[in-house]
A protein has these predicted regions:
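Phosphate/pyrophosphate-binding betaalpha-module
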Residues: 63
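Alpha-helix-loop-beta-strand connector modules within alpha/beta enzyme cores
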Residues: 13-33, 70-84, 131
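Short acidic, Gly/Ser-rich segments with clustered Asp/Glu that frequently serve as metal-coordination loops
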Residues: 36-41
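Aromatic/hydrophobic pocket-lining residues that form the small-molecule binding cavity
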Residues: 13, 17, 44, 67, ...
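C-terminal extensions of enzymes
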Residues: 175-216
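Single conserved hydrophobic/aromatic residue that forms the stacking wall/gate
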Residues: 1-7, 11-12
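Shared catalytic-loop signature of beta/alpha-barrel
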Residues: 49, 55, 66-192
Length: 216
């Protein structure tokens, strides 16, 4: 489960995490925290220290995307994997993140990093630096479908028995260009989605939805 943790009062954020931690106690659930680069370095560090006991899979975008040194500082001071990259759109930008040891997990967005081809280049570069890749997934059902195919093809970063496989970020908020755009929408069942195996991305666009939302 990914939690968006953005707020001005540290005590409120702490209480929120305590409630979530209590609700998920003894359950087979992994938590990720996304702060959408809401904080400066010092506040992100304080929050990160408070989050360490929750054994997070990752701490996403703790500072603004441009603050590469800030990412690196947090990564060196926290015992939580640092994730980022959804707002980085070029291979050269990701190269800078990797060279500065700024992130543990790269999150290119297939819809804005050059599509499937661009994502493949970023994935190969990330793995050459030993960086895990877990794409950011947002937007339309077409972006979802492309992301699912890419995620399914990503090899484990470290070839070992206990290597982690990437997971699909699956937003369930109301969005007509996700549910209504496909003739057969994706269905989440027990935390899993079947990977389409038809031609192309494996999906069929609902043309009635296109007509409904088109503008002249």
């Amino acid at each position: 489960i990914q939690v968006g943790l953005v707020g001005s009062e540290m005590c409120i954020r702490d209480r929120c995490m305590e409630s979530i931690g209590h609700a998920l106690k003894n359950k087979n659930v992994t938590l990720m925290i996304d702060t959408n680069h809401a904080y400066g370095r010092s506040e992100a560090l304080t929050l990160g220290k408070n989050l360490q006991s929750y054994k997070l899979r990752w701490y996403e975008e703790p500072v603004v995307p441009e603050d590469i040194k800030g990412y690196a500082e947090l990564r060196s001071k926290l015992d939580i994997p640092i994730a980022g990259g959804e707002n980085e759109h070029t291979l050269f930008g990701f190269k800078s993140l990797f060279e500065n040891n700024a992130i543990d997990i790269a999150q290119p967005d297939i819809g804005s990093c050059g599509g499937i081809t661009g994502a493949k280049h970023i994935i190969n570069l990330a793995h050459s630096f030993g960086v895990e890749v877990n794409p950011h997934v947002w937007g339309s059902a077409i972006a979802q479908a492309a992301s699912i195919q890419v995620i399914a093809s990503i090899p484990a970063t470290h070839f070992s028995i206990f290597a982690r496989e990437p997971i699909l970020e699956y937003d369930q908020s109301s969005h007509p260009f996700r549910r209504e755009l496909l003739s057969k929408p994706f269905e989440l069942v027990n935390g899993m989605i079947n990977i389409p195996d038809n031609k192309g991305l494996g999906i069929e666009v609902n043309l009635e939805t296109i007509k409904k939302f088109k503008t002249n």
